[in-house]
Amino acid sequence: MRSNLVLAAGFSLLLVGAARAADVAEVPRADAMFAPVPMTSDEWIVTVRGTVSIAPKFEGSDRFGLFAFPGLGFRRASQPVQFSAPDDGADFAVYRQNGFSIGPVARFRPGRYLNDDARLFGLHDVRWSVEPGVFVEYWATPGVRARAELRHGVRGREGFVADFGVDWVSRLGAFTAAVGPRLRLADAAYQRDYYGVSFAESALSGRFAPYRPGGGINSIGAAASLGYQWNQAWGTTVFAGYRRLMSDAADSPIVRGIGSPNQFEVGASVSYSFRTGL
């Protein structure tokens, strides 16, 4: 446990240190995202997004599946376009000033079912979940963004999960590239839902030992994306991510027996934006 706490502290210092280092380095002229935005327009920009990805069939799985899901975002027409990483939750900034943004966020989380993998026989299903919460974001420079999300499941899984990340963002014409580290923390309820095994499940499955994980570090990893804005309406993005399960999640007999602590994901999305008066 002490080594995990040291690892978490070191990782957090890395994120903070990276943002501070970029803050003192020479950077290009600050772009529009740092300017106060007048909220006078009654028009909104609505962005509809479709995403497909290849990812583990469930958290901790060593088998991959194809996933497709929609996305929806909106902002005032007077607000500048801001970078959003593919692994960001859907959010709306209620406050945005001097590089800081804060507001509600939500994310869809797939479940885990027996038809995902017959080797799960004897274990409980994990129902898909919607996780509402709050996000905080800070642009230290036009090219460095730090973001945190705290969410809580309201269907199926009811635990808390917190995601932290820093992105180095580079814009060249219509291209936007980004890469950065990720850290996820989860409470005991979240961990037990996906990685726990009760005594009854252990006896029924005949495969998994009883296991009751606690909260703490769920994973560390990295994410990268490359986007291209074809015009004011259409954009495309390709992305990849890696998470390494840690601590109690990695020690789960589910992960050790039929899964893997190495979680990879690749995908692509298409977005369409239009103006409307709401």
Indicate residue ranges for each PLM-predicted region.
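Transmembrane beta-barrel strands of outer-membrane/channel proteins
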Residues: 46-54, 87, 104-110, 134, ...
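Solvent-exposed loop/turn segments connecting transmembrane beta-strands
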Residues: 57-64, 125-128, 151-161, 216
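Outer-envelope beta-barrel architecture signal
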Residues: 40-48, 64-68, 79-81, 96-102, ...
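Flexible, solvent-exposed coil segments and beta strand-coil junctions
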Residues: 47-53, 112-116, 127, 140-147, ...
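Cleavable N-terminal export/targeting peptides
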Residues: 1-41, 61, 259, 276-278
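Membrane-embedded beta-strands of outer-membrane beta-barrel proteins
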Residues: 48, 70-72, 90, 132-134, ...
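Transmembrane beta-strand segments that form the barrel wall of outer-membrane beta-barrel proteins
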Residues: 48-56, 80-89, 117-121, 144-154, ...
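Outer-membrane beta-barrel transmembrane domain signature
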Residues: 22-23, 78, 91, 153-163, ...
